[in-house]
UniProtKB/Swiss-Prot annotation:
Subunit and partners: PSII is composed of 1 copy each of membrane proteins PsbA, PsbB, PsbC, PsbD, PsbE, PsbF, PsbH, PsbI, PsbJ, PsbK, PsbL, PsbM, PsbT, PsbX, PsbY, PsbZ, Psb30/Ycf12, peripheral proteins PsbO, CyanoQ (PsbQ), PsbU, PsbV and a large number of cofactors. It forms dimeric complexes.
Gene from which the chain derives: psbD
Residues reported in the UniProt entry to bind chlorophyll a ChlzD2: 117
List of residues binding Fe cation: 214, 268
SUPFAM superfamilies named among the record's database cross-references: Bacterial photosystem II reaction centre, L and M subunits (SSF81483)
Organism: Trichodesmium erythraeum (strain IMS101)
Name used for this protein in its record: Photosystem II D2 protein
Binding site for a plastoquinone: 214, 261
Length: 352
């Protein structure tokens, strides 16, 4: 008698079928992260394009902000909601808009729509890098690096206005709108004298410097392994040998500075660490601003400058500039407060 022993075929459930379809090899990988990434990215980008093309900011900021009103690419924006909306999520079906799309746009609903979907899209993109790294079998350092931009976006567009009294104080989605927000941070928070801003600048500019030095050093030490006019065509993605000389690069920088990286892994980790740490530090600083934490205050210099007209430092000059920013920006930037400053109390520069 013959006995056939076999493994019973397991029943494939709907989850397994969906998992196979999401992870199928295609031109654009979808994956589980794509369920979050693609809809949110589509809606946030679509909301921004719609708002900058058609929607005015007259009802929220008293400004023109769309192509339809004559703005250009640098001046269009989706402005933050009206101050009276507080921290409402401004759903289209909520009590503020009540399914009225025109009213929803007027009170700033597109801003919250774009901000929230944009935040989830960035998180989805980070998860996408983790998912693909796991499938390919590599480390998830790309995703770790991308947490820096996510932290900046969430802290600036969500955490800061949450710490303030309304979404109104968030930056608008536009080039000139971001510039206005930067001036606001300086005038009302003295942001450039905040140590977390200093660490952020050091990280970003330091990362740019490291990137430039690394790229130039690699180009300088390429092996002459081709007969073409340039060395780019001599490289093959699948080649087993090195394409540049680490030993030569180490000797070069040892002569320049006296010290140099001798370990490629430490070098590239350092290039990852510097800019990402800078982004995270600036994000922490923005969260501090949300709760109105102050930057460095050199009160002794302010007191001496108040008593001695001949004593002035760059710090005291910057404090006066901040006062000027507040005085000039407040009436236009916060129309709901109905500020009215007499001409004689507004700061006047020598050139005015």
């Amino acid at each position: 008698m013959t006995v056939a022993v076999g493994r019973p075929q397991s029943q494939r459930g709907a989850f397994d079928v969906l998992d196979d379809w999401l992870k199928r090899d295609r031109f654009v990988f979808v994956g589980w992260s794509g369920i979050l990434l693609f809809p949110c990215a589509f809606l946030s980008i679509g909301g921004w394009l719609t708002g900058t093309t058609f929607v005015t900011s007259w009802y929220t900021h008293g400004l023109a902000s769309s192509y339809l009103e004559g703005c250009n690419f640098l001046t269009v924006a989706i402005s933050s909601p009206a101050y009276s909306m507080g921290h409402s999520l401004l759903f289209l079906w909520g009590p503020e808009a009540q399914w009225d799309f025109a009213r929803w746009c007027q009170i700033g609903g597109l801003w919250s729509f774009t901000a929230l979907h944009g935040a989830f899209a960035l998180i989805g993109f980070c998860l996408r890098q983790i998912e693909i790294a796991r499938l390919v079998g590599i480390r998830p350092y790309n995703a770790i690096a991308f947490t820096g931009p996510i932290a900046v976006f969430v802290s600036v567009f969500l955490m800061y206005p949450l710490g303030q009294s309304s979404w109104f104080f968030a930056p608008s989605f536009g080039v000139a709108g971001i510039f206005r927000f930067i001036l606001f941070l300086q005038g009302f928070h003295n942001w450039t004298l905040n140590p977390f801003h200093m660490m952020g600048v050091a990280g970003i500019l330091g990362g740019a410097l490291l990137c430039a030095i690394h790229g130039a050093t690699v180009e300088n030490t390429l092996f002459q392994d081709g007969e073409a006019a340039n060395t780019f065509r001599a490289f093959e993605p699948t080649q087993s040998e090195e394409t540049y000389s680490m030993v030569t690069a180490n000797r070069f920088w040892s002569q320049i500075f006296g010290i140099a990286f001798s370990n490629k892994r430490w070098l590239h980790f350092f290039m990852l660490f510097v800019p990402v740490t800078g982004l995270w530090m600036s994000s922490i600083g923005i969260v501090g601003l949300a709760f109105n934490l102050r930057a460095y205050d050199f009160v002794s210099q302010e007191l001496r400058a108040a008593d001695d007209p001949e004593f002035e430092t760059f710090y005291t000059k910057n404090i006066l500039l901040n006062e000027g920013i507040r005085a000039w920006m407040s009436p236009a930037d916060q129309p709901h407060q109905n500020f009215m400053f007499p001409e004689e109390v507004l700061p006047r520069g020598n050139a005015l």
